Amino acid sequence: MSSVWDERAEAYRTSEAHREGKDLDLLVEWSQGAKTALDVATGGGHVARRFREAGLEVVSLDPAAGMQPDVVAPAESLPFDEGSFDVVACRVAAHHFEDVRAAVKEMARVARDLVLVSDNLFAGEEAEEADRVRDPSHVRNYTEEEWRSLFAGAGLDVEQVHTYVHPVLLEPWLKRSGCTGKDAERVRQLVAGRLDGDRVRLERICLKGRKRTDG
């Protein structure tokens, strides 16, 4: 799978949909006061970039070497000691994880204080089919309740949750994952009810979790 992401690396680095966003601003806001951070599944490196601009010492991590991370490793097996970073963040990547529960537990393990996650919300099976057809590396989006359970199971207390509508341009969304021909037409059919002009309405969730301390 990493070879697929190596091929997509430049598209994600230059993607307007990934370079900016309310969730990106929120992750930076929530990390105020932290000194060190880990950006899990960094992709185009946008969280790492914004964290560095905010003055944090950042390590970026991704399973695909083509994304040019500081460390090449999967989210489910982070090569760091417990409590290595003040904050661990993961933006719009968890829906690709084969074992999201293990990944959240790993993020909590290497975090000293905070785990911050943003991702697209589960919007029904039709939306899931559209995501899988558009991008076969898609595993699943999760509901707010599922995210809260994942955080709790990793020893994280959810302090803040923010959800919002995140519109993305349809055709660049398809192109970014190499979706063409009949597959692209099928996706257009599946998302027809979520279109506002040339944009698809996605729902996004951001969660701020604080690591529990004994006692």
Predicted segments, located by residue:
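Class I SAM-dependent methyltransferase SAM/SAH-binding core
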Residues: L38-S77
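Short alpha-helix
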Residues: R140-G155
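Short catalytic micro-motifs in class I SAM-dependent methyltransferases
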Residues: V92-A93
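Short, glycine-/aromatic-enriched active-site segment of Class I SAM-dependent methyltransferases
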Residues: N120-H138
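Conserved Class I S-adenosyl-L-methionine
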Residues: G44, E159-G215
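Conserved class I S-adenosyl-L-methionine
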Residues: M1-G33, H46-R50, V165, E171-L174
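A short glycine-rich, Lys/Arg-flanked "PGG" loop and its adjoining helix->strand segment in the class I
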Residues: R101-V115
